[in-house]
From Swiss-Prot:
Protein S19 forms a complex with S13 that binds strongly to the 16S ribosomal RNA. The gene is rps19. SUPFAM superfamilies: Ribosomal protein S19. One of its GO terms (molecular function) is structural constituent of ribosome. The lineage of its organism: Eukaryota, Rhodophyta, Bangiophyceae, Bangiales, Bangiaceae. Signal peptide: none annotated. It comes from Pyropia yezoensis (Susabi-nori). It is found in: Plastid, Chloroplast. One of its GO terms (cellular component) is chloroplast. Keywords: Chloroplast, Plastid, Ribonucleoprotein, Ribosomal protein, RNA-binding, rRNA-binding. GO terms for biological process: ribosomal small subunit assembly; translation. This is Small ribosomal subunit protein uS19c.
Length: 92
């Protein structure tokens, strides 16, 4: 179920303020955030946002195609470790 149109997209207030400040100043710096649920808006395009995955911050460069998606979609939280095939000869 999608979010109601009259509410608008969810964006963390502190993240929105920092994005607006960067747009006014014209600086390019990496913003750290823990808000994986924030929706990417057109103001964020061209910025690099370091999103927390539960262990460390991963830098995400925001492009046009990402608008409307959540920040957490681009940072995996789980690492897949392949199943090691057992060495049967060593067990004997």
């Amino acid at each position: 179920m999608s979010r109601s149109i009259h509410k608008g997209p969810f964006i963390d207030v502190s993240l929105l303020k920092r994005i607006e400040a960067l747009n006014i100043s014209g600086k390019k710096e990496v913003l750290k955030t823990w808000s994986r649920a924030s929706t990417i808006i057109p103001d964020m395009v061209g910025h690099t946002i370091a999103v927390y995955n539960g262990k460390q911050h991963f830098p995400v460069f925001v492009s046009d195609q990402m608008v409307g998606h959540k920040l957490g979609e681009f940072v995996p939280t789980r690492t897949f470790r392949t199943h090691v095939k057992g060495d049967r000869k060593a067990r004997r």
